[in-house]
A protein has these predicted regions:
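Beta-propeller fold recognition
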Residues: 1-375
Length: 375
């Protein structure tokens, strides 16, 4: 098990849980940006401190921010050797600290938590947004789909400033090559920030789509006329290959399906987007079931920003983007929806609505409803 310490620490650890009744510490590492020191704890708990100037590449945890990116464990081929690795974003920096956070780490689990690769994620120049990778990275492997005709994984993630990336961890092409697929054009004023994992799905033609939304969790109650968050669905026409030299796209190459009757994207469009309502923000990852994608959304309380706002769940055709339904869930923020056996389960931080709608009911702070038929 590999896990991070959350927003309070810049640290990850690994436990051997072969015997769940007697877990064994494997390693821990930590970044201390205030003192420019990285620390490593071995299996027996022995601690080693190294300053940034002396650190070797295999112990370079200096880009590690708040440990909020959930590690994904996969097997990749490094040279001729198969290795089990943990991959995760470098984490949070409060949207302010430029020295750390904007990277992805690939860690050798069995070999003492050494860094196999630290992949820097470029910060966009000129938008005054300090970048980071706080969401988890999402691998696509042969274990998850038969369309993955490679060893290892193609990895997708969105960074803090709403850029979508594709990372090559396969045995084909250049290992660790990073490619920008899409730029959500984040600015200080539009507040398009990504905190939540992208959700992936294949369409009927085995094209891969990445779904994610924006919303500044650091400023969840913010209200002004310049905030312009969006839902995005971006198509990767090159999947399952990693094609070099691809030019990234923006919303200009996607279909705006905000308005009713906008129509579906054509073959020439690289995806779709929806403009959220005034001050609205996405509060979790998307969920997909039966050709419908669901997004949790949040609108702050305009009259009293100290009180909870309203939680919503919107449903859209997954390749079309047309809005099938938007449900007022009640007071507070909604979690990422979980879909199980045709039912949607979604938590809410405040009081659920008294009349959510037909087919929906609340048990304390858990709201349960029926999925919507796809289009």
């Amino acid at each position: 098990a590999v896990f991070g310490m959350g927003e309070g620490e810049h640290s990850y650890s690994a436990l051997d849980i072969t015997d769940i009744n007697a877990p064994k510490h494997m390693w821990t590492f930590r970044n201390d940006p205030s003192n420019s020191i990285v620390s490593y704890w071995s299996a027996n708990g022995q601690k080693t401190d190294v300053d940034y100037a002396s650190v070797t590449p295999e112990r370079d945890y200096s880009k590690l921010g708040q440990a909020v990116s959930t590690p994904r464990i996969i097997r990749i081929k490094v040279g001729t050797t198969d290795k089990w690795v943990a991959i995760f974003g470098a984490g949070g920096n409060g949207g302010a600290a430029t020295a750390y956070g904007s990277a992805v780490y690939v860690i050798d689990i069995a070999d003492k938590g050494k860094v196999l690769k630290k992949i820097d994620v470029p910060d966009k120049v000129g938008n005054s947004v300090v970048n980071s990778v706080v969401s988890a990275v999402i691998p696509v492997t042969a274990e998850t789909t038969t369309t993955a005709v490679y060893e290892g994984a193609l990895v997708y993630f969105a960074d803090f400033e709403s850029k979508l990336w594709k990372l090559n961890l396969t045995n084909k092409g250049t290992l660790y090559e990073l490619q920008k697929l899409f730029d959500g054009e984040a600015t200080v004023t539009n507040q398009r920030r990504v905190f939540h994992d992208v959700t992936l799905s294949l369409d009927d033609n085995s094209k891969l789509w990445a779904f994610f939304g924006t919303g500044d969790r650091y400023n969840i109650a913010a209200e002004n006329s310049l905030i312009n968050n969006r839902l995005f669905a971006i198509k990767d026409d090159n999947y399952p290959t990693f094609k070099t030299g691809v030019t990234s796209i923006t919303a200009a190459q996607c279909k705006n399906v905000t308005s009713a009757g906008a129509g579906c994207p054509t073959a020439a469009d690289d995806g779709w987007f929806v403009n959220l309502d005034a001050n609205e923000k996405v509060s979790g990852s998307a969920a997909i079931f039966d050709r419908v994608v669901y997004f949790p959304r949040y609108i702050p309380n305009k009259l009293n920003p100290c009180n909870p706002g309203k939680a919503f769940l919107s449903a859209h055709g997954y390749t079309c983007g047309n809005t099938l339904k938007k449900i007022n869930l009640g007071d507070g923020m909604a979690t990422t929806p979980i879909i199980y056996k045709g039912k949607i389960y979604i938590g809410i931080s405040g009081a659920p609505g008294s009349s959510i709608g037909s087919g929906w009911n609340a048990v304390d702070n858990l709201i349960i409803g029926n999925t919507i038929s796809g289009s």
